[in-house]
Amino acid sequence: MRDKNLEKQLRLLTLQIDSWKKLHDLITYALDKAKPIVSAEQERQFTETRANLLQETEHAFRELGLLGELSGRAMNVLQRGVSVRGVRELTNDEIRRLEADWNGVFTKLGLMQGQLKSRRKSLAGQSMVSYHLARVLRRDPLAA
């Protein structure tokens, strides 16, 4: 059996994770002092990725039930990293906070993706009748 809402959440989560990975790649490049040149293309990619995250994060987190838990951390990352050059100029303390916030968001998204994939796998083995029967049997008769 397939759950349309579950599939929607997984697609949304996959897009978020991909954007956070792209942002991480660009931040990592910016922090590598051995790479002296920041190209206009890298700045464009950074700005585009950051803009996508700014536009989609609140909606995605709300749909996934993570808004209260992750929105502050996500905004901290997006506000600290305004450009590749800007990331390069952060102090060591700011870099540690940026990395910690990014890691917190990314870890939670990855954990949720694993949980949703596990739920999808368990649903794949159920028929429509057994799924609805299990829901009815789990329902609290006093909760109406």
Identify the meaning behind each predicted range.
Residues 1-144:
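Conserved non-transmembrane functional hotspots
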